[in-house]
């Protein structure tokens, strides 16, 4: 799919990729597609996340293959990304088509994680919104100066970008969760943004709507450990406990470490009745501050399809244990 999308370009490709780290086989396929685009005269640019000289967050962010990126016939800019990550996974093609979702361009992302890919074809208005966000990153090389693109509806779609509209996005998702009358379905590695966490706790307690979802249990436990240390945000813990005790399951992924597999539950989806939010955005306070993107899609068929995907994922795993497995 990646090579096919690149092969469809005739004029421009702009890549905003948080993590770009491929093994020999996949590297050959993707690099060959980029090489063919270069031979066709396609102008290509890439922004990617790199470490910033600041205290390392827990867990630490992924590191792209800078040597691979430098070897490609693409103009590139590294965006310093700690504590606020350049977390996008999108491509804009020919000012008309957009590839986005939760999928990093890594072998583990493609083979070991739950992820979602969204392709928006032939929609210049949505593509323009993504181009504006890309240009902000390209011009400023600063996460905090990006995401200032107005979230306007275009034919049932609305593109959201953070950090410029991070808090607005959390508020919008929270509002639609609260207004839902039939279903709320969520996949997110963590759920820590106050508006969403509080609203979920309320609707689960009220039992007014069918709520269910899946998280990454390992990352949730890491959040609990952080909150036990940082008492300024400890107030969120009872809300998280209430939500996780509801109809949520969790994947016990491999803890992050040098040389470990990255097999996280990585999809980022929120379905509220017939509206879906999907993209790179974890439902987290950090997500509000990162460079992220989300598509808000008002389409019943897409909502049905992604709600079914959430149910498929959550059926694979058991209840969320906030204490590490085996600890008493």
Predicted regions and their residues:
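Acidic/histidine-rich, surface-exposed loop or edge segments in extracytoplasmic proteins
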Residues: 14-18
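PLD/PLD-like phosphodiesterase catalytic module centered on the HKD motif
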Residues: 3, 25-99, 103-139, 150-154, ...
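Extracellular glycan-binding segments that recognize GlcNAc-based cell-wall polysaccharides
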Residues: 22
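A short, well-ordered alpha-helical element
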Residues: 1-7, 175
């Amino acid at each position: 799919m990646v090579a096919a999308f690149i092969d469809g370009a005739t004029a421009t490709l702009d890549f905003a990729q948080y993590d770009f780290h491929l093994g020999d086989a996949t590297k050959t396929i993707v690099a060959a597609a980029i090489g063919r685009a270069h031979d066709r005269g396609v102008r290509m640019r890439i922004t990617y996340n790199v470490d910033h000289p600041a205290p390392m967050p827990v867990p630490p962010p992924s590191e792209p293959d800078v040597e691979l990126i430098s070897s490609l016939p693409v103009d590139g800019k590294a965006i310093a990304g700690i504590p606020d990550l350049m977390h996008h996974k999108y491509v804009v093609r020919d000012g008309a088509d957009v590839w986005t979702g939760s999928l990093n361009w890594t072998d583990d992302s493609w083979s070991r994680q739950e992820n979602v890919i969204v392709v928006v074809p032939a929609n210049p208005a949505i593509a323009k919104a993504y181009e504006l966000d890309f240009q902000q990153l390209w011009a400023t090389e600063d996460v905090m100066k990006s995401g200032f693109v107005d979230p306007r509806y275009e034919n049932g779609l609305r593109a959201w970008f953070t950090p410029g509209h991070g808090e607005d996005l959390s508020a919008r998702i929270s509002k639609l969760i609260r207004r839902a009358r039939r279903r709320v379905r969520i996949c997110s590695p963590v759920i820590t943004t106050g508006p969403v966490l509080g609203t979920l706790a309320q609707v689960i307690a009220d039992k007014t709507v069918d709520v269910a979802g899946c998280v990454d249990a390992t990352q949730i436990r890491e959040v609990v450990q952080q909150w036990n240390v940082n008492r300024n945000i400890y107030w969120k813990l009872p809300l998280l406990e209430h939500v996780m005790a509801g109809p949520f399951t969790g994947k016990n992924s491999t803890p992050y470490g040098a040389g470990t597999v990255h097999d996280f539950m990585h999809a980022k989806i929120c379905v509220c009745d017939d509206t879906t939010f999907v993209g790179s955005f974890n439902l987290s306070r950090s997500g509000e501050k990162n460079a992220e993107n989300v598509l808000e899609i008002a389409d019943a068929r897409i909502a049905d399809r992604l709600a079914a995907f959430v149910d498929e994922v959550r059926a694979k795993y058991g209840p969320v244990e906030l204490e590490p497995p085996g600890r008493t």
